[in-house]
């Protein structure tokens, strides 16, 4: 019974990634219609990546459940080791293309935290599907003590390095903390912004319209390292401003799709991709499935 429940939840994580890549149109991002601002990946590349990562989603939640009483840092280390192996398998599947590196990191922590939370709340194991927004908040809060050390440990000594990863370079140049920052703060962008917004949207609109509006909302608020990496601070600020204006127009679903299609070409021309917003979109979907919003 326990394994079946954990398996079903890990499949919701995979489903969240599938929903994210399938949502269309998404400006600058890979979707069903085109490859956005990416010339090295496609919809099929994302499918290959997800299939490679899927077994690890199961491992993340099972690890959290099995080691729920362990010190948070020790649980983090277990999850990170699994996540690094998953990353290797992902890169093999995509021939070296980074489709889900940051999202895999975040999902490892959130699935691990979900497993740990389930071990402490056995009623959810027998009454699966009754996750509340309070449960979501509690799961995200479990990540905070696991990652309290992370910024200092990973980014505090970069002055001794000569070569930086993409994430390290963003921190050195702009102070952008990326997925590490989200995790160390307990995913407050999710709990305080994305999920409240989506709960409101889904109560008023059909699922696809709600998802598209959520994407626009995230693009208007997220500190998006992908955009900043590709275009700098001003390009990122420009995208945020454009998305705020789009939200204010309160367009019909048909007009919203047309506007997003047009903006997609704009971002393609500038080689801009809001990958940070896309990752948070997928994470929001994961909790939306747990809460039965979708």
Curated annotation (Swiss-Prot):
The keyword Transcription regulation does not apply. The keyword Nucleotide-binding applies. It comes from the Bacteria. It is an enzyme of class 2 (transferase). Pfam families: CitG. GO terms for biological process: prosthetic group biosynthetic process. Gene3D superfamilies: Triphosphoribosyl-dephospho-CoA protein. InterPro entries: CitG (IPR002736), TriPribosyl-deP-CoA_syn_CitG (IPR017551). Its EC number is 2.4.2.52. GO terms for molecular function: ATP binding; triphosphoribosyl-dephospho-CoA synthase activity. It catalyses: 3'-dephospho-CoA + ATP = 2'-(5''-triphospho-alpha-D-ribosyl)-3'-dephospho-CoA + adenine. Keywords: ATP-binding, Nucleotide-binding, Transferase. Belongs to the CitG/MdcB family. PANTHER family: 2-(5''-TRIPHOSPHORIBOSYL)-3'-DEPHOSPHOCOENZYME-A SYNTHASE, TRIPHOSPHORIBOSYL-DEPHOSPHO-COA SYNTHASE. This is Probable 2-(5''-triphosphoribosyl)-3'-dephosphocoenzyme-A synthase. It comes from Streptococcus pyogenes serotype M6 (strain ATCC BAA-946 / MGAS10394). The lineage of its organism: Bacteria, Bacillati, Bacillota, Bacilli, Lactobacillales. The gene is citG.
